[in-house]
């Protein structure tokens, strides 16, 4: 077993969920637990959130859904975002999983199995409003509008879409997608809707509809970035959203020459909590003289006599090689630099400036925590906090704190 410990504070995740519930005053709040709960434990997270009355859980694949269903009661709704395929349709039915249908072919498959089983099957529909990754396109939606028999035998419970730039609060693409979504929903007046991911929740109540489905915010990740738009709405809209630049959409977005501003509900009064702490012990210490080389390819050379500590984790554990000679870890709240190349199983840190009483074999080093959050780590290596969490390896000893 690994010497490193990954602690997941379930109370922090529950706190984040309650915060999001407080913002979504007119909508239910589900939870995205795909990719094993963003790498930190889908089953444990789901069980904790059920205690907060969360009833909707989103996974990516049928396999993820089956694993989650085995841990949860049958009355909890589990949504499979990738939809249904011929090879897994029977398993979705067996394990009471609801597919999010992304194209007419998936609708056809689900309807076929509805006929085969002689039962009405639940489903969500995903409408593409501009992310252009998944979802029924305009032509397919038009077919559904004109031929409702395409949904015969199916219990359409929700229509969803996904925002492409929700973390950019002033991005006009958000409003364009919102209006496109509303246009589509007019043809399905009795069907509930879901649009807001984590960033969408903070865009305001217009984006909440009936169900929000946060992921990042549950795990303490920042779902908002600051972007300044100096172009007028129309200029920005026409330049960056050609797929949606229709007269209908532009006219429905109010004054096209007005810069958009969004207000975060109660901005500043809410703080998401980081639920993840990764700790590793010092397993080796060595004294090196001036001009000693450290690690593969000698990419770091000491500029003084130095004390170098080795920690038992590396890129096989999701600690990116991009941290080589950059980034920091913490010992008793003191910053310690990473030196040399990150290798598969080991990293080196320079502890020369620490008090001698804090440098010893077995000393606990914080890799991820309140001093170095996933978002901060991500900013160092040019990625996002989501990737930091989902990359965490399987070798860590995991400890769940209630």
UniProtKB/Swiss-Prot annotation:
Pathway(s) it belongs to: Amino-acid biosynthesis; D-alanine biosynthesis; D-alanine from L-alanine: step 1/1
One MF annotation (Gene Ontology) recorded for this entry: pyridoxal phosphate binding
Coiled-coil annotated spans: none
SUPFAM superfamilies: Alanine racemase C-terminal domain-like (SSF50621), PLP-binding barrel (SSF51419)
Modified residues (N6-(pyridoxal phosphate)lysine): 34
Cellular-component GO terms for this entry: cytosol
Residues reported to bind substrate: 133, 344
InterPro entries registered for this protein in UniProt: Ala_racemase, Ala_racemase/Decarboxylase_C, Ala_racemase_C, Ala_racemase_N, Ala_racemase_pyridoxalP-BS, PLP-binding_barrel, RPE1
Domain RPE1 insert: from-to ranges: 226-271
Leading EC class: isomerase
Protein name, UniProt field: Alanine racemase
Gene giving rise to this polypeptide: alr
């Amino acid at each position: 077993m690994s010497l490193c410990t990954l602690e997941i504070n379930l109370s922090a995740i529950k706190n984040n969920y309650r915060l999001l519930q407080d913002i979504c005053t007119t909508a239910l709040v589900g939870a995205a637990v795909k990719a094993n709960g963003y790498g930190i434990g889908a089953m444990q997270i789901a069980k904790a959130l059920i205690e907060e009355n969360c009833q909707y859980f989103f996974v990516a694949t049928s396999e993820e859904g089956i694993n989650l269903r085995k841990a949860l009661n049958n009355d909890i709704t589990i949504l499979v975002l990738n939809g249904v395929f011929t090879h897994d349709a029977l398993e979705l039915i067996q394990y009471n999983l609801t597919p999010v249908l992304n194209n007419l072919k998936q609708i056809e498959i689900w309807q076929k199995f509805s006929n085969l089983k002689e039962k009405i099957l639940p489903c969500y529909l995903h409408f593409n409003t501009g992310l252009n990754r998944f979802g029924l396109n305009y032509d397919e939606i038009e077919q559904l509008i004109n031929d409702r028999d395409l949904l015969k035998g199916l219990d359409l419970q929700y229509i969803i879409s996904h925002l492409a730039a929700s973390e950019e609060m002033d991005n006009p693409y958000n409003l364009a997608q919102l209006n496109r979504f509303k246009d589509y929903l007019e043809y399905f007046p009795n069907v509930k809707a879901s649009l807001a991911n984590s960033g969408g929740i903070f865009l305001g109540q217009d984006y909440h509809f009936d169900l929000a489905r946060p992921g990042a915010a549950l795990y303490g990740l920042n779902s908002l970035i600051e972007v300044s738009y100096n172009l007028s709405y129309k200029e920005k809209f026409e330049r960056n959203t050609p797929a949606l630049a229709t007269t209908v959409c532009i006219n429905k977005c109010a004054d096209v020459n007005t810069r958009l501003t969004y207000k975060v509900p109660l901005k500043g009064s809410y703080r998401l909590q980081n639920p993840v702490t990764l700790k590793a012990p010092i397993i080796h210490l060595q004294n090196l003289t001036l001009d000693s080389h450290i690690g593969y390819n000698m990419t770091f050379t000491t500029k003084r006599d130095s004390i170098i500590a080795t920690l038992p984790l590396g890129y096989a554990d999701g600690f990116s090689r991009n941290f080589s000679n950059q980034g920091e870890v913490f010992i008793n709240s003191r910053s310690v630099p990473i030196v040399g190349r990150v290798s598969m199983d080991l990293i080196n840190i320079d502890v020369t400036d620490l008090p001698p009483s804090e440098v010893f074999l077995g000393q606990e080093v914080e890799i991820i925590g309140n001093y170095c959050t996933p978002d901060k780590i991500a900013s160092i290596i040019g990625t996002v906090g989501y990737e930091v969490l989902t990359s965490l390896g399987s070798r860590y000893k995991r400890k769940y704190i209630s």
